[in-house]
Structures are given as C-alpha cells and as structure tokens.
Amino acid sequence: MKPKRTILCVDDNEQSLSYRKIMLETRGYRVASYTRSEDALERFKKGDIDLVVTDMAMPGMDGPHLIAAIKDISPHIPAILISSKARVYDHDSQADVFLARGMYAPADLLERIRLLLVRKRGPKRLQPRQPQPPGQIGAA
C-alpha cells in the first residue's frame, strides 16, 4: 500500500477550506488545513507536506508570499495558487499552477494535484533489462 500524500491547504474562507479538505480526503489524501498563512508556514516547517494549495488574497501573509516562504525552505515543493479575482496571474509568483476560483471544476484541481505529485516523485525507475543469451531473442 502506498503512503498517503499530505496536502497543506490554506484559505481564510472556512467554507471553501472545508469543502476542499473533504474533497481531498475522500480521494485518499491527508489534509492539513489552515485559515492563516502564518500557522500554515509553521506546520510546513515540521515536515511531511507533499503539496501546497493556497488562496491568493488573505489577511496577513497572502498566498504568493506564503508560497515564496515555503519555496525558500523547500524549492521543489509543488504549489497551487487559487484566486477569486479574475485578473491576470502574477507571473512573479512561485506557484506552479494558478486557478481562478469559479473558473475550474473540482476534477481540474484533482488532476492538477495528481500531475504535480507525479512530477515531484519523478519518473518511475526502469529496472535494467537482463540480457538474453544469443539465440533466444524472438524465440517463443
């Protein structure tokens, strides 16, 4: 059985956070959810986080600053930034994926998470092939 991946979810909107947490947990992920970026950053420092999903606009530290702080600690951690603002994505952000709230289906978020986790893990290692003795190649 493969170990469950842990996703750090951050959103100051408790309803959105609760929905996202339930959606991810029912798909087999462990979820650490926080309404404050500062608390989420402290949890991240404890380790065992595989991916970050955060809202963009929050009181205190906003989503892009949270992602930057996390990537200062662990540069290869995948991060998804979600915004309710339908504005142009801030290309200075270190997020790997940007999703406009209300403009994506839950299945889109789940697929992005899956792809980012696969990319983080890297390609499956191929087992070296055992050379076949001459004369057996193509023999049935």
Where are these regions (language model features)?
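Acidic, metal-coordinating helix/loop segments flanking the phosphotransfer/catalytic sites
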Residues: 33-51
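Two-component/phosphorelay signaling modules centered on CheY-like receiver
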Residues: 14-32
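Short amphipathic alpha-helix used as the core "switch/output" element in two-component signaling
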Residues: 42, 64-76
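Non-catalytic signal-transmission and effector/linker regions of two-component phosphorelay proteins
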Residues: 1-6, 107-140
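Receiver (REC) domain active-site loop signature in two-component systems and cognate sites
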Residues: 58
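Acidic catalytic/metal-coordinating carboxylates
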Residues: 35-36, 62-65
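Active-site residues of response regulator receiver
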Residues: 55
